[in-house]
Amino acid sequence: MAASPAPAVDPSSVAADQLKSIIERIERLEEEKAGIAGDIKDVYAEAKANGFDVKVLRKIISLRKRDHDERQEEEAILELYLQALGMA
């Protein structure tokens, strides 16, 4: 006996299911991101309550993310500009 053909699948239905799955994943990740952002805000508030300068902490976090050589180059240029303006 010959095998029966597979039922036809509507390509638009498959694409719609895939799109829905992608959207739901993005929404879930956005919710997680908002939760993490709230946690970070709480840590900064704790730091401020303990006497730390939050602006400086943010700058340190930013610097730690960057490559050492890139950071050194920017600092050298900044120093040059400050000297040119008589601020160093």
Swiss-Prot record:
Top-rank taxon, per record: Bacteria
Pfam families: GapR_DNA-bd
GO-annotated molecular function: DNA binding
Matches recorded under InterPro entries: GapR-like, GapR-like_DNA-bd
HAMAP family: UPF0335
Family membership noted in the UniProt record: Belongs to the UPF0335 family.
The protein's name in its UniProt record: UPF0335 protein MexAM1_META1p2947
Provenance organism: Methylorubrum extorquens (strain ATCC 14718 / DSM 1338 / JCM 2805 / NCIMB 9133 / AM1)
